[in-house]
UniProtKB/Swiss-Prot annotation:
Catalyzes the removal of a penultimate prolyl residue from the N-termini of peptides. GO terms for cellular component: cytoplasm. It is an enzyme of class 3 (hydrolase). It comes from Leptosphaeria maculans (strain JN3 / isolate v23.1.3 / race Av1-4-5-6-7-8) (Blackleg fungus). Binds 2 manganese ions per subunit. It holds the Pfam family Peptidase_M24. The gene is AMPP. This is Probable Xaa-Pro aminopeptidase P. Its cofactor is Mn(2+).
Amino acid sequence: MAKVDTTERLAELRKLMKERNVDIYMVPSEDSHQSEYIAPCDARRGSAGYAVITHDKAALATDGRYFNQAEKQLDGNWELLKQGIQDVPTIQDWTADQVEGGKVVAVDPSVVTAADARKLADKIKKKGGEYKAVDDNLVDKIWSDRPSRPHEKVIVQPIEFSGKSFEDKIEDLRKELEKKKSLGFVVSMLDEIAWLFNLRGSDIPYNPVFFSYAVVTPTTVTLYVDDHKLPEEVKKHLGDKVTIRPYNAIFEELTTLSKEAFTKDKADATSKFLTSSRASWALNKALGGEDRVEETRSPVGDAKAVKNEVELEGMRQCHLRDGAALSEYFAWLEDQLINKKAELDEVDGADKLEAIRKKHDKFMGLSFDTISSTGANAAVIHYKPEKGECAVIDAKAIYLCDSGAQYRDGTTDTTRTVHFTEPTEMEKKAYTLVLKGNMALERVKFPKGTTGFALDSLARQFLWAEGLDYRHGTGHGVGSFLNVHEGPIGIGTRVQYSEVSLAVGNVVSDEPGYYEDGKFGIRIENMIMVKEVETSHKFGDKPYLGFEHVTMTPHCRNLVDMSLLGEDEKQFINDYHKEVYEKTSGYFEDDALTLKWLKRETAPY
């Protein structure tokens, strides 16, 4: 990963800032829909974080997943703010500290949430500065070769995979609106729109979504999407129940809708429009601001996170195919490195894995860039290998592969860490501690109402006992042929994970890890589904919940330190490996190499 020279870009941006009377400009990584993954046309900065530019300084704030990468890629123009580290200011505090003397801070209002804008405006005002919206994005103005906005076709996600009609989903949403006496809900998150209407797209790499907004009122449904993206099949699917309007018409029409709703003879003093708490400042302004808008956790997002039985079965089935693909890949890679002494780089590995996945039924693409990382690169949590710059896979070093795919019946995300020769004692110890944490989380039983925040330490406990830890969450929600990272649930120390309890039908990842910069990295990730479980008692007359694993890929026996495992843990691994073999070996009737590898890796301890 080479350093990126940003001197010329910063000079151009600062020139434009002076022309617009802007002293400080803020550049979030999200798009107008607060998407985590973005289209190339919205890639105004890197993977995750926040950039702030003044006339003589530039700062980048990011979290622990990207510290290593940022240090390698940032040039001397930038100050790196490692968020979450003691005594390091938040990007908001750093920005507020720059406004002395009445400086003007500006942002594109479409790429920040209304809630974040209010908080920062208040902070800046207290410091004597001004926070304002600049409707045209200044980075876009200097981006001479900015890619055009994608216009890919939308497809229908049929009920055989969705398990519920979009009409029924709309009616469920209207019941929520009725409870709140709301005038309507503006849906701005792309995965929520795709799920709500049983549609999928391909406007953002790896995410089967399409650029759109939707407005659902007690009597109308409007989908804001460019008409040329909708084939006849989609129009027939939507029928006359949904009005189609151009994507760019949303702001003007929201303003009109709000004005009409709040005329003196119509308005109920207590009624407001609902938006997601992640809706943009621009949307909030179009609706008339706080007096006319209630921001809430999205009822669509909440419903989407609870998979129905059809979606859950789809997740089970796609993980069988995906597990078979991963076993074939690891068997092939070991054979290439050990027996054939082949020289393969990290991209070669990622490309081979994608080719194997493509052979499987219902494959639609990858769910994110494959993290194919050898040795020290495995310590870069969100490493992305680049051809010509990446490392050759070293058979004598740890190899970490974090990968996933999109299938019509589900989304996968699996991490396995392997070693093809002789790992060090520390590598084996760290791997086994991570594996113990992975199992502890999967095996827990907990009362209904428990949050992912409360469960996080289960996965870290064995690392903590040795004074070790990892700088990322333990689990994230996963969509059904949708985004691989899905809210509102998760397992980790983020505040939002304490706000929503886990429920039957949730699908989350279980992915503790351990990383030593410059040496190696370890992560083990399974997908687990929340289910109701039997217990001897039911304290407080509450149902108790647990997890069902759906990932079907063996753990690396070469990295396990058996002396650190209890008998119950050994039995748990043996039972899991028996299940993996029974459910996936049938894929290898004509593949002796993979079948031999699978038998060895799933043999009892």
